[in-house]
């Protein structure tokens, strides 16, 4: 037993040593945001695309630390903006993880792919789960699919509902996310109801969520809510109350306009209050 423990501890120490020794001076400078030191190292000929044993690049480290000036310097020197770690993590994913809109913008301006492959960690899902609505907006503006569906995670909207990040939920809905699309048969409304998050439940219903949708257990959202909770009570009242005609008309108009043309609503010959209403402003 003692020999086994000794071997395990030895391996841990070796792994830690490899990690430390595998980090380059560029990694250290990027991690600490030391721009002058980083530039000097680049001028000395250090490879900006050097990676650790886990394929972590200096650009990964700079973005994780929200060091946008270091990220710019690395990219200007030829750093690969789409480099991935052994886990498939990109610098853009790291930027979205910490809510660094500046780093995300720099990466996207220099060719970073706004959307991951299905089997890779997804920047828009990460931003949605962390409540980083600025990154969500940036990714969508650069072409990320607002309804990007990853089998084990669902859509960004579903992820935001599970994490109870109302600002991200609102941003995704305003950008045209499908309010019915969640994970498998579970809708975003089911997720919000299960979390007893009445504010998100109200928001989803405002955008036309189906209160009668059934999940894989054949439950409606009201049945998925915790018993005797505020959300359960709200949904029971909502089910028994006729919806305003204005709300139904807004949903119908937005459906007809289509997500790709939402930006044209501002150009419709309508009074400003009505245009604002159609855009949930």
Locate predicted features.
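Ankyrin repeat start-site detector
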Residues: 21, 53-54, 86-87, 119-120, ...
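Cullin-RING E3 adaptor/co-adaptor recruitment helices
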Residues: 207, 212-281
């Amino acid at each position: 037993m003692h020999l086994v423990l000794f071997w395990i501890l030895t391996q841990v120490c070796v792994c830690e040593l490899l990690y430390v020794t595998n980090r380059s001076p560029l990694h250290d400078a990027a991690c600490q945001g030391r721009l002058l030191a980083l530039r000097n190292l680049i001028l000395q000929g250090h490879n900006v695309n050097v990676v650790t044993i886990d394929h972590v690049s200096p650009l990964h480290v700079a973005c994780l630390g929200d060091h946008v000036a270091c990220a710019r310097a690395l990219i200007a020197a030829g750093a690969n903006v789409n480099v991935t770690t052994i886990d498939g993590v990109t610098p853009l994913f790291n930027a979205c993880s910490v809510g660094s809109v500046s780093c995300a913008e720099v990466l996207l301006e220099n060719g970073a792919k706004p959307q991951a492959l299905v089997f890779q960690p997804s920047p828009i899902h990460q931003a949605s789960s962390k409540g980083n609505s600025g990154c969500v907006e940036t990714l969508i503006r650069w072409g990320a699919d607002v309804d990007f569906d990853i089998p084990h995670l669902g859509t960004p909207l579903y992820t935001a509902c599970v994490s109870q990040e109302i600002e991200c939920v609102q941003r995704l809905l305003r950008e045209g996310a499908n309010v019915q699309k969640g994970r498998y048969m579970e809708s975003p409304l089911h997720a919000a109801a299960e979390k007893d998050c009445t504010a998100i439940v109200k928001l989803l219903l405002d955008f036309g969520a189906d209160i009668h949708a059934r999940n894989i257990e054949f439950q409606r959202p009201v049945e998925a809510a915790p018993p005797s909770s505020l959300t359960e009570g709200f949904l029971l009242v909502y089910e028994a109350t006729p919806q305003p005609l204005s709300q139904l008309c807004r949903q119908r108009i937005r459906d007809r306009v289509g997500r790709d043309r939402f930006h044209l609503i501002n150009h419709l010959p309508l009074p400003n209050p009505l245009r604002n209403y159609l855009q949930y402003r």
